[in-house]
Amino acid sequence: MSKAYFIGAGPGDPELLTVKGRRLLDSADVVIYAGSLVNPEILKGINAEVYNSASMTLDEITGIILKSVESGKKVARLHTGDTSFYSAISEQIEKLRELNIEYEVIPGVSSAMAGAAILGQELTIPEISQTVIFTRLEGKTPVPETEKLSKLAKHKATMVIFLSAGMIEKVKGELLQGYSENTPVVIIEKATWKEQKVVRGQLKDIVNLVKDSGIKKTALIYVGESLRASSESLGKESKLYHKDFKHGYRK
């Protein structure tokens, strides 16, 4: 029996697929990709049976994997971004374990990280925010009570919100339970794609920003005071490179 590989395809730009991910994709006999999210440019030139999972059920996906590995074929299951965020690989892995199918997970570049690179900044700024919260607004998939957006907002940490641009009015209301209305926000649609959009503003204006730009989905919402670093000097320095800071490599 062969093996299945869950591969993070990165945010969209084909050059942001990892070297290992590219190698496994190119050598796969069967590729199952998230067609509504993965950039089709990534699939160009591959010599494999290709299945678009956009309209498939969990059982249909695992059925293809089972049939393929039993035939000795290498399977690449291609997900957008990094597999650790909202990829639904957990339920697929449970099925593979039940079927005694060997698998391996290959990480990818998350759109959240790509977005920070687009902004040209880090998300943790000394004395301003040393915590980043990755989350989503409750939708069809419920979230635990302690992870409601309104409760997370009270930390005032840097926040990256997935899968929520289509419910922007509710997002604003929840965020205002913790952040001030003047808190910087950035919305990035289709990060690193040719169609990429970047919109900046303040929390009080976030609804109009999203609606006026025509952003509806496949967008990330960044919130927090750390976002000022992409447009102004904050004068906050870490101790790491301070001349008086001593460590094992600099005494």
Predicted region positions:
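Class I S-adenosyl-L-methionine
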Residues: 1-109, 114, 219
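Short secondary-structure boundary/capping segments
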Residues: 22, 42, 67, 123-125, ...
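A generic local structural motif
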Residues: 15-21, 37-38, 62-63, 120-121, ...
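A contiguous loop/helix-start segment that scaffolds small-molecule binding in enzyme catalytic cores
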Residues: 2-4, 60, 71-75, 131, ...
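Active-site catalytic pocket residues across diverse enzymes, especially alpha/beta-hydrolases
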Residues: 46, 119, 123, 175, ...
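Class I SAM-dependent methyltransferase SAM-binding "motif I" and its flanking Rossmann-like core
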Residues: 2, 13, 82-85, 89-155, ...
